[in-house]
């Protein structure tokens, strides 16, 4: 579980507010990219506190946008903050933050879905999987359009211990639509229990730590936003390959709850038929 960290007294020098940055660089949220800006630094500070104690930490922030959470992370006295931003419009504002925190903020123009974060930090930060989590964190206010595919990608990385998890059990603090956040953290028997619940919880300790009202964002989304914290488990709850677990779970949840056994039955039947066909082929090859 994440410790409750305190923001450092070593803070950034006076800077324009995020709202002023948006006006200065004439930034507008791109609807096609599901962008929503979080301008209230009290909320961005809260997200950072819930990530744990970031003093001297190495942080990978995804989708920094105009830099609200970025400021809060830098104010937490991290050793290094790496931000990956796809939208070039935000780079000048982020560069202003970099100039205010010399040597601490590294800006990469790229796509979080393809960026190789396993090569971003020093090898010396790596810790054995069985140890406590490394001093590496992932934090992000994710655009709704990429949040689900990105967390599925990272869950697969956890199962393989690659990507951001080459450093060990890297913790993540991320935003999702409230409904998605509730599904990720839903307990067994909950009406919110879903494919995402199983996929996340068989690999991680998942906590929906708080909810941010939609009106806190600009532009205001139609839904509230949930902040979710993930800590990879030392031992997964299901000892099977990720793709197999994913396929079985997809089949289970493709039917309504009371009929979900049908999905599991169909997947088991399919796998049985496949095994029988393989056995027949092997027998035929042996006779030849």
Residue locations for each model-derived region?
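Catalytic cores of RNA-modifying enzymes
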Residues: 1-251
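An accessory alpha-helical subdomain
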Residues: 223-226, 230-234, 238-287
């Amino acid at each position: 579980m994440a410790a409750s960290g305190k923001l450092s007294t070593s803070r950034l020098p006076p800077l324009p507010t995020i709202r002023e940055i948006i006006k200065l660089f004439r930034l507008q949220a791109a609807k096609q990219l599901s962008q929503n800006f979080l301008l209230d630094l009290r909320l961005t500070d809260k997200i950072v506190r819930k990530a744990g104690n970031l003093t001297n930490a190495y942080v990978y922030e995804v989708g920094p946008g105009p830099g609200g959470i970025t400021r809060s992370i830098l104010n937490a006295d991290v050793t290094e903050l790496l931000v990956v931003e796809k939208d070039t419009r935000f780079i000048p504002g982020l560069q202003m933050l970099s100039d205010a925190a010399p040597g601490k903020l590294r800006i990469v123009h790229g796509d979080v879905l393809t960026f190789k974060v396993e090569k971003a930090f020093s090898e010396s930060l790596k810790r054995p999987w069985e140890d406590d989590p490394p001093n590496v964190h992932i934090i992000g206010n994710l655009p709704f359009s990429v949040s689900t595919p990105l967390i599925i990608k990272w869950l697969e990385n956890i199962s393989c211990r690659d990507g951001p998890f080459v450093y060990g059990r890297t913790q993540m603090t991320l935003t999702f639509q409230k409904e998605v956040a509730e599904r990720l953290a839903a307990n067994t028997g909950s009406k919110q229990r879903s494919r995402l619940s199983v996929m996340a919880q068989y690999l991680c300790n998942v906590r929906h730590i708080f909810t941010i009202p939609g009106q806190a964002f600009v532009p205001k989304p139609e839904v509230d936003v949930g902040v979710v914290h993930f800590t990879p488990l030392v031992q997964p709850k299901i000892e099977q390959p990720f793709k197999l677990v994913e396929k079985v779970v997809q089949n289970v949840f493709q039917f309504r709850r009371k009929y979900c056994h049908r999905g599991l039955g169909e997947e088991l039947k399919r796998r049985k038929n496949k095994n029988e066909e393989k056995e027949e082929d092997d027998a035929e090859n042996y006779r030849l």
